[in-house]
Amino acid sequence: MGNKFRAKMSKARFEIGDHEKHVISVNANPFLKYIRIEVDGERVIDVPNLVPSRKFDLEIGNAEKHKVEIFIRLLSPVRLMVDGSEVVQI
């Protein structure tokens, strides 16, 4: 259970966009109590995580804009919604 479980609950990568691609990386470490979110390698969120669940709203893209919602819950996989539809991790 060790590494596989830890990776599933603390790190996730998603690719969004049809013509304008973006990669969203989420690192939510419940033991060190921080959340870091990067878009295309640039850190956009770096906050302490002191509660069991958090939601972050972002707008991503230039020509192709997307409303992104990131849901982080303790001991659960990270969920990402883009324009109301769930995105699968890469």
Regions found by a protein language model. Name each.
Residues 1-90:
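Cysteine-centric segments in proteins
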